[in-house]
């Protein structure tokens, strides 16, 4: 009797990548890899790689914790996920990070932009004017986050390019007056490179502010393909200015398979040598926004492949150092390290997260301490700023026997690697998106998961028409 060439691991819901109708999807193991297999009644079967490491994929399933609920929900459950965003009461996680787009305008025209931003006055996609949002509109969006969160952990100002907004510092001052613990500025770094006085003024808002700096490559050809401009000197000048004022910075690297994935280790080494840099975030491209010519079979670069590249291209981390993030383990992986006396010490050189997240029999006694396990969950959370991560880590280390805690441990001693895998129509997984904790604030005040926003809810998105059809057909 013939047998299948795969193991059937589980079942979820996805969408057809062609018509975006909801379809059932199998999770299959085959030849050491994990696939999402689905069948649309109109467009037939399709299969996409979602992980190339079965062991790590299975490990992710154990890194879950009860979700934190927002104080209020924004929409009722009416049409089913992903057509009720949000947040609706069926969503399993609050907003670890809330993203506010303050402008449609940008001083670059990146080929991979998910937001369709650019320097032209009118969008070629929506045929609507690109504009800066007013201070009143932005305050409305900030207040929507605060209404959901009470005290928001992290708010990120994005765009477009937020630093070209004519009221940029008024926006920063407004945000800092609100109950928000940490503010991120998502930027391409051009203004930071060109205007030292701008950086000095930004530094006056320390602590509690961080630069989320685009940094994709050291190679001109890569930057030309991704960003349309050779930005090497811009990056160098920006980081020099940020170092001058020790302004907390995370490098964010957009990864394209076969283009800049060979630079992962070099970027980490560079980041470790910069006083202002607290970490690196790697984001593989997904089929969204302006991206053209994306082939899901050829170009898919899953989280597990990025994790492996970090391990292969650097000597800083071991496999057990890079672990799933409990609030959204399917999409996020993280490694913490200490920078002490010029040396980098991986966090798991001091503690082993597995021993705390998965309480095993016959293990050390202190792993049974629920408060200790909660402190580990708190540490491995996307809602941390470098300063709050330092505090959380110090509290954790103080609980552990025989672990010396540096007297001067502060946010300058923290270094974090993050892998963020966003979903698109090909690898969309309803089970996973329900745990999404990175949310974009819609102009009407709804907080919507990053993936569903770009797929269904962004003006001009591929799924906008599908969303309207579903809602009309099922209207009460």
Task: Name each model-derived stretch.
Residues 102-104, 114-117, 159, 187, ...:
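Glycine-rich, histidine-containing beta strand-loop boundary motifs that form or position
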Residues 226, 232, 243-409:
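Radical SAM enzyme [4Fe-4S]-AdoMet core and its adjacent flexible, acidic
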Residues 28, 32-56, 61-187, 191-197, ...:
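Conserved alpha-helical substructure of the radical SAM core
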Residues 138-156, 165-284:
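Radical SAM/AdoMet-radical enzyme domain recognition
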